[in-house]
Swiss-Prot record:
The protein's name: GTPase Obg
Location(s), subcellular: Cytoplasm
Gene: obg
GO biological processes: ribosome biogenesis
Organism annotation: Chlorobaculum tepidum (strain ATCC 49652 / DSM 12025 / NBRC 103806 / TLS) (Chlorobium tepidum)
Subunit structure, as described in the record: Monomer.
Length: 335
């Protein structure tokens, strides 16, 4: 399935039905009073978060959503039917903005979360409401009110426990394919991963966490170089960053510093997230390789996804980090 993480749509709630002009017509009551019913309300438009959805692809093909119009009022004080509501499913992690104002309307985070995005118009009153002592046979009724109408911009930010960060060919796709059932494209050239991939990593005792493979960052990504900020935003919602540097990198410390700099330029708050560093591709490490000391308080592990080296220790540490975040996100945000 094609991955799409931004889309624009228009939504239109239903107009309210018009009120009815009607008079009682019964045997022996030749001049009955007004009995026009009210119009039904227009249908509302809702957004509903659905964890089964992973892309905004559907909105590339359908860009307009219109709820049903309210039914018109009838005689004998019968109200028109309410218009049919429209419920639009979106992936968890979708941020919705009003195109005209730029205002963020909602952030759809929880599965099943639902919000009314456009309210249907109120139905008009029938002529029964306008009878008075001096006007006993009103020959008018209210029209229905128009439903709300908006242009919306949607942006998907993937929700994962662990975000993989590294230059192209750091081994991110290989790692996620080994630890989970995800099957990203893997090849020995830069930018093999062109879209984010999500994988569920199974841990002991039926525990699991979600890992996101973000397309490779290059220097200048925050300014739009390479794949640019198109996918950097997907790191924002991750709880823990797993920064990956290959063992055969000429200057591991410099590459690590560059990755942190790109994250900081995009969003300084990313550096407050817990992070773990892994030196990858240990199966092809130089003979004189030594483990680097990169930053005080940041753990560094060595792995080889191909040889299976260090993967158990990595899963243990990632689970520890994710568990801390799940227990007390605010307390451990900078740990």
């Amino acid at each position: 399935m094609k991955f799409v993480d931004s889309a624009k749509i228009s939504v239109k709630a239903g107009d309210g039905g018009r009120g009815c002009v009607s008079f009682r017509r019964e045997k022996f009551v030749p001049k009955g009073g007004p009995d026009g019913g009210d119009g039904g309300r227009g249908g509302h438009v809702y957004l509903r978060a659905n964890k089964q959805l992973t892309t905004l692809l559907d909105f590339k093909y359908r860009k307009s959503y219109i709820a049903g119009r309210g039914g018109h009022g009838l005689g004998a004080r019968k109200s028109g039917k309410d218009g049919k509501d429209v419920i639009i499913g979106v992936p968890c992690g979708t941020v919705v903005r009003n195109v005209e104002t730029g205002e963020v309307i909602c952030d759809m985070v929880e599965d099943g979360q639902e919000i009314m995005i456009a309210k249907g118009g109120r139905g008009g009153w029938g002529n029964q409401h306008f009878a008075t002592a001096t006007r006993q046979a009103p020959r008018f009724a209210q029209p229905g009110e128009p439903g709300e109408e908006y242009e919306l911009e949607m942006e998907l930010k993937l929700m994962a426990d662990v975000g993989l960060v590294g230059f192209p060919n750091a081994g991110k796709s290989t790692l996620i394919s080994v630890l989970s059932a995800a099957r990203p494209k893997i090849a020995d050239y830069p930018f093999t991963t062109l879209v984010p991939n999500l994988g569920i990593v199974r841990y002991e005792d039926y525990k699991s966490f979600v890992m996101a493979d973000i397309p490779g960052i290059i220097e200048g990504a925050a300014e739009g170089r390479g794949l640019g900020i198109q996918f950097l935003r997907h790191i924002e919602r991750t709880k823990t960053l797993l920064i990956m540097v290959p063992s055969n990198t000429e200057d591991i410390a410099a590459e690590y510093a560059t990755l942190l700099k790109e994250l900081e330029k995009f969003d300084p708050s990313l550096l407050s997230k817990p992070r773990l560093v892994v030196i990858t591709k240990m199966d092809i490490a130089p003979e004189d390789f030594t483990m680097p000391e990169l930053e005080k308080g940041v753990k560094v592990l060595a792995i080889s996804s191909v040889a299976g080296q260090g993967l158990k220790a990595l899963k243990d540490e990632l689970w520890r980090q994710v568990s801390l975040q799940n227990q007390s996100p605010s307390e451990h945000a900078g740990s």
